[in-house]
C-alpha cells in the first residue's frame, strides 16, 4: 500500500510506522505517558487505510480511531488530541510571524498588526501549549476558527 507524504513523496506504508507515530506521541518526554495501546490503535487504523492515502489523512483517521476508544480508557481522548494538534502543527509554519505573513498576503491580517508581530510576538509562542486543549476543543477550533496557517496559539 502506498502513502503520500506531506512533501508529495509516495512511499510504502508500513504498520510499524503508524505504531511508531502513535507511540511517539505517547512517550515523548514533554508528555505524560498515557495508558493506551498503540498497536491496537494502529491495527484499527490500518484496516481503514487505502492506497494513496495522505499522511495527514492517516493522522485524522488515527485521531478518530483513538477517540472511538475513549470508553476503554479516557487517555484515548488525550491521544486523539495529541495526534490532531501534531497534524495541525505539521501543516502550519513553525514560526508565528511566518504564519501571519501568509495570512497577511491573503488580506486576513493588517499592516499595523504585522508591525507589532515583528517587534513582539514570536517569543511568546510555546508550541507545547497547543497540547493543553482537549480533543473536542481542538477539533472545534480546527473546524470553525483556525485559518489554514494557524495553530491554536496562533489564533
Residue ranges and their predicted role:
Residues 1-155:
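Extended catalytic cores of very large enzyme megasubunits
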Amino acid at each position: 500500500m502506498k502513502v503520500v507524504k506531506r512533501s508529495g513523496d509516495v512511499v510504502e506504508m508500513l504498520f510499524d510506522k503508524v505504531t511508531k507515530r502513535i507511540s511517539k506521541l505517547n512517550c515523548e518526554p514533554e508528555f505524560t505517558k498515557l495508558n493506551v495501546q498503540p498497536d491496537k490503535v494502529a491495527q484499527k487504523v490500518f484496516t481503514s487505510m487505502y492506497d494513496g492515502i495522505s499522511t495527514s489523512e492517516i493522522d485524522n483517521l488515527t485521531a478518530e480511531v483513538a477517540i472511538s476508544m475513549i470508553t476503554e480508557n479516557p487517555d484515548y481522548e488525550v491521544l486523539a488530541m495529541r495526534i490532531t494538534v501534531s497534524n495541525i502543527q505539521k501543516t502550519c509554519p513553525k514560526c508565528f510571524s511566518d504564519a501571519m505573513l501568509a495570512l497577511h498576503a491573503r488580506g486576513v491580517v493588517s499592516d499595523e498588526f504585522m508591525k507589532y508581530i515583528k517587534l513582539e510576538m514570536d517569543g511568546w509562542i510555546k508550541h507545547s501549549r497547543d497540547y493543553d486543549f482537549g480533543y473536542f476543543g481542538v477539533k472545534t477550533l480546527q473546524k470553525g476558527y483556525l485559518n489554514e496557517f494557524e495553530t491554536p496559539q496562533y489564533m
